[in-house]
Design a protein with these regions (language model features):
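Divalent metal-coordination and catalytic microenvironments
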Residues: 19, 62, 164, 249, ...
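Divalent metal-dependent catalytic cores for phosphoryl transfer on phosphate-bearing substrates
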Residues: 149-150, 159, 170-294
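Short, acidic/hydrophobic/Gly-rich beta-strand patch recurrent on exposed beta strands
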Residues: 37-42, 200
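Acidic/His-rich, divalent-metal-binding segments that scaffold phosphate/diphosphate chemistry
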Residues: 94-213, 234
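OB-fold nucleic-acid-binding modules
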Residues: 1-16
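Acidic, low-complexity intrinsically disordered tails
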Residues: 311-345
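OB-fold single-stranded nucleic acid-binding module
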Residues: 23-34, 46-50, 54-96
Length: 345
């Protein structure tokens, strides 16, 4: 589609085009007037949007809308002031331009997971992880890893998990005494229960959290899924590796402050925590750099509690590059998928 990418928005420009509604609410200002408050996005990024005409009905979350607007600035952050808005009709837009997608094909990322399962010599872990992948089913191919922060994209959960798996392989060359099967198992299953925690459409847009997600969260649900997978595979729940894997799931946020009721208590659990944090943080910073010109600081990032600087990297263009479209995803170097564990699905 011939329109300006969100990542290249600047103050005072005018915009007319199609965007995807990630959030959409009608709110009431301090003076009692109604207005629309939305997050609109294309595949390169998102922007907060306001429409001060409170008589307009908010579009559904996940809908594609056509807007005529001006880019303004509020509290140091770009904001869209909408003059006109309507829901788009099918055929007016190219969805691949609007949906943030993982930069690699889902099938190739999934093959990295099954390859790791195929390499496992620990039969208990291989059976449990294989069963948990079966339980995740087709939704794993398109689910994001989060609603707004890291890997909030179509196939983001696979992107996050496969990237962590590659980090784990690198770590094992430095610390070969770690239990490879246990570390791989923890990486693969640690966030699978996000599928039960969030409601996502096939475009990878999270519309809400489930009752299960709000009452339990993916850490607690993840533990119950490990136990359920063990039960299905007729593995005693008091088997030590079942308990170790449950501990890795419930401790991978590191501290009670971040949701883990227990800190990591053995080396593979500790390593899982740091691999998870590094991959999430690097993904978030990469997204920030895409939105920030070289030589400039970003707006303050609330999740990091700081601004991020975009250095003048050698050979890099000043303008942030938009993410590749889903159908243009580059092929990712990975272990030979032909040896992947074939019995998972």
């Amino acid at each position: 589609m011939d329109q300006i990418a969100v990542a290249t928005f600047e103050k005072d420009i005018k915009f007319e085009g199609f965007l995807l509604a990630r959030t959409s609410d009608q709110r009431t200002s301090s003076n009692g007037s109604k207005y629309l408050d939305m997050t609109l996005c294309d595949r390169t990024g998102d922007i907060n949007a306001k429409m001060w005409d409170g008589t307009v009905t908010p579009p559904p979350v996940g809908a594609v809308v056509k807007v005529r607007a001006q880019i303004t600035e509020y509290n140091g952050r770009l904001q869209m002031k909408i003059n006109k808005i309507r829901e788009a009709q099918e055929g007016e837009y190219d969805l691949s331009f609007l949906v943030p997608c993982a930069p690699y094909p889902a099938e190739e990322m999934y093959a990295e997971l099954t390859q790791a399962v195929a390499e496992m010599r620990n039969e208990t872990l291989q059976k449990i992880v294989g069963e948990m992948l079966r339980m995740a089913g087709e939704r794993l191919m398109y689910y994001p890893a989060a609603q707004r922060l890291h890997h909030a994209e179509r196939s983001g959960l696979l992107h996050h998990t496969s990237s962590m798996l590659r980090l784990a392989r690198a770590v094992l060359t430095v610390y070969p005494w770690l239990d490879q099967d246990l570390l791989f198992a923890g990486v693969i299953v640690h966030d699978l229960s996000k599928i039960a925690e969030m409601k996502s459409d096939e475009a990878g847009n999270v519309t809400d959290y489930t009752v299960d997600g709000l009452l339990l969260g993916h850490l607690v649900r993840g533990v119950t899924q490990v136990r359920e997978a063990a039960r299905r595979m007729e593995i005693p729940e008091d088997e030590e590796y079942v308990l170790l894997l449950e501990h890795m799931v419930i401790s991978h946020h590191g501290e009670a402050e971040y949701g883990s009721p227990r800190p990591p208590m053995f080396p593979e659990a500790e390593m899982l925590h740091w691999i998870d944090l590094v991959d999430a943080r690097m993904n978030e910073m990469n997204g920030i750099l895409r939105r920030t010109p070289a030589g400039a600081f970003s707006e303050k990032i609330w999740s990091l509690d700081r601004r991020v600087y975009h250095p003048h990297y050698a050979g890099e263009q000043d303008a942030p590059s938009p993410a590749p479209a889903a159908q243009e995803a580059p092929r990712r170097p990975r272990p030979d998928a032909d040896k992947a564990y074939q019995g998972l699905l």
